[in-house]
Amino acid sequence: MGWRQLDIDKVHLALIVAGGFITFFCYFSEVFRKKLLVGEAVLGSITGLIFGPHAAKLVDPFSWGDHGDYLTVEICRIVLDVRVFASAIELPGAYFQHNFRSIIVMLLPVMAYGWLVTAGFAYALFPQINFLGSLLIAGCITSTDPVLSALIVGEGPLAKKTPERIRSLLIAESGCNDGMAVPFFYFAIKLLTVKPSRNAGRDWVLLVVLYECAFGIFFGCVIGYLLSFILKHAQKYRLIDAISYYSLPLAIPLLCSGIGTIIGVDDLLMSFFAGILFNWNDLFSKNISACSVPAFIDQTFSLLFFTYYGTIIPWNNFNWSVEGLPVWRLIVFSILTLVCRRLPVVFSVKPLVPDIKTWKEALFVGHFGPIGVCAVYMAFLAKLLLSPDEIEKSIYESTTVFSTLNEIIWPIISFVILSSIIVHGFSIHVLVIWGKLKSLYLNRKVTKSDSDLELQVIGVDKSQEDYV
């Protein structure tokens, strides 16, 4: 009988991989971020792929028990709540008051257009699902992810060249639309699982739009205002120390996540608007540096999550011809989604968005709408909500759409996320190369102009330049 302490445990292997990767990234973060221009999402996904069940086979989250889908949903929930709160407190004070029109246009028309267009692509390319199933798939990838555009809105070299109004617009949009994707997601869920359809429409308006979203926003604002009021007096009477002050960006979103889940409201919107009201007068952000504990928390969560994502990518299903998922359909769907989901509508609404001044900025904003954590969250939440345990037996057995969606929704969504990581993760390299080529061209043009001027000064005809 061997020494029990030396038995290898799967969870401990996962801790070694996660801890080792984060340590490695921290030691060489300057190289990765500012020289190689590679962010947490790309490196984390690669690490998860290497050590996951399809390569080294050291980490397989779905072998830890029978609740893999639920575990993934809760991991995503915590990461999203912390991230959207961090986005909210990063914005200038009273940002929504001064930029309300830009935010509303970027949330409602842009998200609605992307949802419907993506649903059309899914319906055309995946014949085994009906249009409601296509709307559900589109609802999962309606929101944008701030991590994949961290080099633009964070501390990357391109962030300094991005106008502050564009940077703030992207932060506000990516932080808010994670929660705003909930009505689009539940629209299909309600129509699929609630019969008759008029009851589904009633539940969607009353329970999802008004209670989950509207009341979630209101409750988040109340919590944010109260906590800001308490913080103000805690500082005034010196009741709070520095360590506790830096713990708030983690504690408050966890509080919102727990309360929101228990009372059944949209905890993502609740966390975001709690952050907005918490920092409405810059009370919090003016006393905390950009590269302090909140940034550290966000980085750690991002590294852990995308490493986890790399281990759950269903590579075996990316050429699943039996289920009508040949890889060419996934590639075409991903390309169409990334190209047409935002760019056309952002160009269309550009005159209505005061923060977007030029067509070049419209192209920039339209392109940087990456798909990430929220898509994983909603894909696995859809699997839970469409399981036999959550749907009336008569409704579940009346159609095969539930079992079909349960089988194909994650392969489709994960392939789109992977495509987004590749495209948006390396877009920065294209921009840098383009900038260098443009600079080289302009320098050569200036040099040639100076040379022509010198020839004119010494009286040499330009046609005789070769003989000088």
Swiss-Prot record:
Keyword entries, A-Z: Antiport, Cell membrane, Glycoprotein, Ion transport, Membrane, Phosphoprotein, Sodium, Sodium transport, Transmembrane, Transmembrane helix, Transport
Family of the protein in this entry: Belongs to the fungal Na(+)/H(+) exchanger family.
Glycosylation sites: 287, 319
Membrane topology value: Multi-pass membrane protein
Pfam families in UniProt: Na_H_Exchanger
GO cellular component terms, semicolon-separated: nuclear outer membrane-endoplasmic reticulum membrane network; perinuclear endoplasmic reticulum membrane; plasma membrane; plasma membrane of cell tip; prospore membrane
Biological process, per Gene Ontology: intracellular pH reduction; intracellular potassium ion homeostasis; intracellular sodium ion homeostasis; proton export across plasma membrane; proton transmembrane transport; regulation of membrane potential; sodium ion export across plasma membrane; sodium ion transmembrane transport
Role summary: Sodium export from cell, takes up external protons in exchange for internal sodium ions. Involved in regulation of pH.
Disulphide bonds in the chain: none
Annotated compartments: Cell membrane
MF GO annotations: sodium:proton antiporter activity
Source superkingdom: Eukaryota
Positions of transmembrane segments: 12-32, 36-56, 81-96, 103-123, 133-153, 169-189, 204-224, 258-278, 293-313, 320-340, 362-382, 408-428
Residues where Phosphoserine is found: 449, 451
Xref: InterPro entries: Cation/H_exchanger_TM, Na+/H+_antiporter_fungi
Protein name: Na(+)/H(+) antiporter
Species this chain originates from: Schizosaccharomyces pombe (strain 972 / ATCC 24843)
Protein encoded by which gene: nhe1
